[in-house]
Amino acid sequence: MALILAYQVLYYMPRMKKVDEARRARMAVEQVEKAAVERSTGEGAGTAGVGVDTLRTPADTTGAGSVTTAVAGFPIVEPAKIRRITVRTPLYDVALTTAGAELVSARLARYRTQGELVELIAQDDSPGLGGIADVSLLGDDRTLPLSSVAFDAFAEGSSAPLEDGAVVVIDKGTPGAGLFFRVTGADGAEIERYYTFDPESYVIRSGIRFGSGGLPFVRSVRWGLGPGLRPTEVNVPVDLAQLRVSLRLGDEYHRKKRGDFDERFSGTVHWAALQMKYFTVALMAPTPVGGEARLEGRKTDGFMTASIDLPAAERQGRVEQSVDLYIGPIDFDALKALGKGLEKNVELGSKYLRPVSAAVLWSLLKLHTIIPNYGIVIILISVFTKVLFYRLTHKSFKSMRDMQALQPRLQALKEKYKNDRQKLSQETMKLYKEAGVNPLGGCLPMVLQMPVFITLFNVLRNTIELRQAPFFAWMNDLSQPDVLATLPVSLPLLGNAVSVLPVLMGAGMLVQSRIGGSIAGPESSATQSKALQHMLPIVFTVLFYKMPSGLVLYWLVNTVLSIWQQYYINKGAEKAERERAEYAKTS
């Protein structure tokens, strides 16, 4: 895994970035050359210095991709003249460009990876490729994408265009401040795109305004996300495996992971979103409205996009429409507070386990307000769950010990009735009844606890609060394996990391199996039981070796408490046996 990560970070990603940049630059040049050819052939007559906007028939309408010529032309982006504007708030820095008035960078001020601010958007400044909140104007038989249109950028209240590299600072003293992008076509048609920022929220309002007279064909506005998000974690392959695209339509939620798909939907549009393990970007309709949506993906390169088509409502000759952008962490409480159902994207397990997972997450966060160390909080949760299931596990351990005590008598029955299975079954059940032993008593309580463990697994593995949360010493990130040292060679199944908690957990499981004892019986059964006692701790150590250290810490504490409980039960049973023996002697 470490070698794959090194290859991704040091060789593959930089190389692919160069290839992608070259491809985008080539496409941009081809666009400009195409516009020049159209002007020289007279298709753009009367629009000197202005590129003819290319209207494409929507693929989801006709599938033909035919091209027609617009009545009015808009300036086409020239790569050398693209201006990049940065908006800085206490929560994030976002960059927008005059190429389509799109958002091309979003860095979160409160989250870092290897010392650098987390960057969510996998997009550069090349025009015509779409980005976050890219817009296309849709008609019955044509589409006008704005990605290649050259806008001018203005700060709120200013009539002077912003220059390349301008920084607009928005703090608590300037809530609701905005950034505006304007363009005028050859026939006077105007389009304005705007962004409004709240310095205390990860939500950005993005809107568009234009006169319906200049663009009479427009029936709806398409808002797009994609072609993916930038990996934010050190372990790039694992982070890419968590890439998802999702959609809420009415009361239905649609989620797709990496793969080949192209699905279209119609209904009441709420939102569409892209997400990695800990962060998400979502397009939300301010008010749910009837429209269409599309989700696309390619397995080969992880390409994923989402788009929503919302109707263009005209008022007094003007069309205005907006969406809300959420660009930030997958924080359950923050997403739930939006009232859009985006908290459904938090990985909390199946719909049957989500209520339990939500309760566990709530407990985790509340305890952390009192104890500012998530490692100690996890230990307390482990102790609490052990107390909660104490009687169940007590019955389980006691039942297993009782079964061990019955093994000699059960073996005698097998020898006595080895040729009569029906009689053997009857006598076995009779023995269980006389001894007051339930053959399922050892495993049933453990089965009942499994949903809780699965719930804790989901919460501890996916919650943003544990990202880079330290415990103590070398354990500086409970969302990652605890790495004490790195070996010069990679070991099979384990990699080159030296992790302590999984080894301690495996050792604890071995001690627990020794204390629990093995099943008495013939030599072959005893040998198998002993082999199983040694194998299970090894299997669990390998299984948990690359798990988040917060989850391993929970299981380690649970194992230590189980050792104490088993020891206590054994001591009680031995004392009872001695008392029975002494009573038998005196009587």
Task: Describe the residue ranges of each PLM region.
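Soluble non-transmembrane domains of integral membrane proteins
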Residues: 79-346
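Intrinsic low-complexity, intrinsically disordered segments enriched in polar/basic residues
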Residues: 43-49, 54-57, 61-64, 68-72, ...
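Helix-loop-helix
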Residues: 1-33, 38-39, 96, 208-209, ...
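Juxtamembrane extramembrane loops of integral membrane proteins
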Residues: 9-125, 181, 585-587
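N-terminal start-of-chain detector that recognizes signal peptides
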Residues: 59-70, 177-181, 252-256, 293-300, ...
